Amino acid sequence: NTMSNLSGFVKRIRDIMRNDAGINGDAQRIEQMAWMLFLKVYDAKEQDWDMNEDNYESIIPEECRWCNWAVDDRSGKAMTGDKLLDFVNNTLFPTLKKLPVDASTPIKKAIVQTTFADANNYMKDGVLLRQVINVIDELDLSDYEESHAFGDIYESILKELQSAGSAGEFYTPRAVTDFMAQMIQPKIGETMADFACGTGGFITSWLKVLQKQVQSTADAKKYGESVYGIEKKQFPYMLCITNLLLHGLDIPRVFHDNTLLKDVLDYTEDDQFD
């Protein structure tokens, strides 16, 4: 049963990470999980784009794509130990942080660089790192039921942030955001913006209400374009992007930027939301 396997997911990772001297406390554990989950979820998206787009090209160099370094096909070829640690610290991270991104880069490609800009690998033990990667790679995100169920697990990971102290400020309880979305009753075609969106709670509650209204390809396109967010802190930004990819948004229009810095005079008609 999908759910019972998944409910043990967070605990299995926590138990492995507990043995790694580099992980200090819950916030770091969640941050460590976050970049791996992002790459796993992004890889599932890329498999989709590969199938559905002509000549899809990944922004990630081949050796750094999750499917090429993280997946362990049990042939004995998968990196582990010091070799894995060296690859993650000295190839993967520097490469993703320096991906060439400019104003013309499509959002769905640019998010890899913006997500990794301040990410860290805290783990110091390559064997434990391999174990965690294998647990994460067991997720079958191509399976609708499983990826849907994983959305709930992801929610529980975000909820843990509340008790992890420092990062709790980014998390608004789901009961609150769901209630607000139901009161607003958004309709397909309406847009919303959250200018301090944290891990994406309001946005995903809004999408939950809209998803039930999607009847056609045109609706699906409007659904995908119905939200906009800004988060100035790196860690919740990464969590938010992953959250939106899990909610079926191929182009998460959430930007890592400080809304408060943008002078009110800079806003144009186009920048207005419902």
Set out the residue ranges of the language-model regions.
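Non-catalytic, mostly N-terminal accessory regions of nucleic-acid modification and defense proteins
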Residues: N1-M183, K187-I188, R253-V264
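Conserved S-adenosyl-L-methionine
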Residues: S166-Q272
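Short, intrinsically disordered, charge-balanced linker/junction segments flanking boundaries
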Residues: N1, D271-D274
